[in-house]
């Protein structure tokens, strides 16, 4: 996510770079700026509250340094990872490149995924490594995130510890998932909760509701794949707002008036 709200993730596949241990990236130990980075990290760790923006900026600086100096062996590892992960990773990387090129632009204004993917593959075939550079930067990040999470899980299991995680019922409006499969969402609606004892005005969670008929027409492939991705990392999954599979408060995207909202 671009903010600190964990349920506003830009992907149901990729891992958040915020959790990357950049000290384990190849090239970190010999970096001239290592002491400066570690001094800044110490200051950030001493804060009473997490400064998400500053943490992201520092980690991005380290990642860029290490990626720009990655050797052939490291890049071969990244390419092998990208080959194994297929379209999930490619879609994520292309999305991130578009987001960097068009900051603040809603995904509904991006060119379609199939078009962008085809153009990228065609350009890559002609220009080779140069065309890959931006895309591989994000594959590099995910490669080491997956590697670190895998090692963490192995260590936990050796000590008889299980890993449990949340699966939010919704996905971010400006996400890879909405970009790749907009037909699975009602983009003119937003999910939330009706007025109650805790919130007199109700709640607007900001993410689009699902088109369950479109989901069913594809045998719920998107959902089955989402669970499969999470099962790679987790031993147990808590579905946040499981009632959302049966009914959810739907608010017109163009209106904050809860009187126009209803359960669907």
Please provide the spans of the model-predicted regions:
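Acidic/aromatic-lined carbohydrate-recognition and catalytic surfaces
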Residues: 1-182, 215-216
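Divalent metal-binding pocket/active-site signature
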Residues: 244
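Substrate-binding/active-site clefts of carbohydrate-active enzymes
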Residues: 154, 162-233, 247-264
